Amino acid sequence: MYHDYASKLLADYRSDPPLWESDLPRHNRYSDNILNSRYCGNKNGAAPVYNEYTNSPEKAEKGLQLSDLRNFSFMLNPQHKNIGYGDAQDLEPYSSIPKNKLFNHFKNHRPAFSTHTENLIRRNVVRTEKKTFPQVASLKGTQKNCLTQPSSLPSLKNPKNSSVPSTRFSEHTKFFSYEDIPKLKTKGTIKHEQHLGDQMPGQHYNGYIPHKDVYNILCLAHNLPASVEKGIAGRGIPLGNPHVKPNIEQELIKSTSTYTGVPMLGPLPPKDSQHGREYQEFSANRHMLQVANILHSVFANHSIKPQILEDIPVLNAQLTSIKPVSPFLNKAYQTHYMENIVTLVPRFKSIANYSSPIPNYSKRNSGQAEYFDTSKQTISRHNNYIPKYTGGIGDSKLDSTFPKDFNASSVPLTSAEKDHSLRGDNSACCISSISPSL
């Protein structure tokens, strides 16, 4: 079905790739072809919307219309076509978007992926009429109202009862409350087949996916509500920030655990210990323990082929580069942490030294949170939060049981993974495998 649908979309492709896709390799122009051949009026090989050589200079200057953008709004959300292009109320129904600003416009209002990750995901997403890239909405709200109680979270076991929107947030998005977004509540469930690692034979990705993108990918996998995503990534509600009430942090982690089915790690420290550097360090480490459990649940307990994960080395880098050395982490926490890491590490092939970025919270724009650029700002400049640790596989500081010549190819596959490998179908292993009920 995947190949048939792709062939149908690509049949009438006649134009050069659009500006925002020009950095992708020419052997896989799937997204370009969708945008040009079907959703931008170029169905029958006619001149593309971007044609600068048209006889109508006015048309050339005008570029894409918002009405054209709505034609492929399924990339954001097919049910709410006015959401995802910034504040919908600020745009006239058919206001033009100059083509030279189109790329920046989308970059600011789509999921906060880095260019590398966005290209990776855009290249490997199967888009059909009922599948969606979760939309980014700029909505009004306040920090105090952004909690989601566990009882309101949909259950993975019964996804048909899901009524919580899959809203994506960029760094530029303000806090929100569910009262602000009644239009975004969806009925039923949206199936997702985001292929995170399918690629051409022999092709490898250099570098790694930035820290925050791992959480975005994780939330894509589970279709998590935005407030739960904030709990996972430690973003909207800053986990470990001494200025945030501890019960908010506890509720967010509880919501995350309830939604993903991952057990809680235990109670927070006493209230008299929930301030200052020690608590920040404890909370940050505790948060990574919880994330390790969630990633373990998503990637290690489901039939995702190791070769898929090899293309996302940052997951390995993140989990193996953080060592719980805080004096507030007792032996039970460390044991639980290492069990998850040891289970996950064999799924990966390579390791990169990595330091985790942390949020930089600013009062600008009434509660908006700013975040360090992964490539520029790292934890090494803020050692009072998490001890910097750049060890990896084979590093005795991490775990003395790992051989220095460790090779992931020697790890035996599970029966489900063997089945996928025998089929030789890259597209067979996708995020929808995480929850067969979807």
From Swiss-Prot:
Keywords: Late protein, Virion
Location within or outside the cell: Virion
Gene Ontology CC terms: virion component
Induction or repression: Expressed in the late phase of the viral replicative cycle.
Signal peptide: none
Principal location listed in the UniProt entry: virion
Renumbered residue ranges of the record's region Disordered: 145-167
Cited function: Together with the penton and the other minor capsid proteins (M1249L, p17), forms a complicated network immediately below the outer capsid shell, stabilizing the whole capsid. Plays an essential role in the formation of infectious virus particles. Especially required for the formation of the capsid vertices. During virion assembly, associates with the membrane and probably mediates the docking of the penton complex to the inner membrane, where it recruits the capsomers to form the penton core.
Family designation: Belongs to the asfivirus p49 structural protein family.
Protein name from the UniProt record: Minor capsid protein p49
Organism: African swine fever virus (strain Badajoz 1971 Vero-adapted)
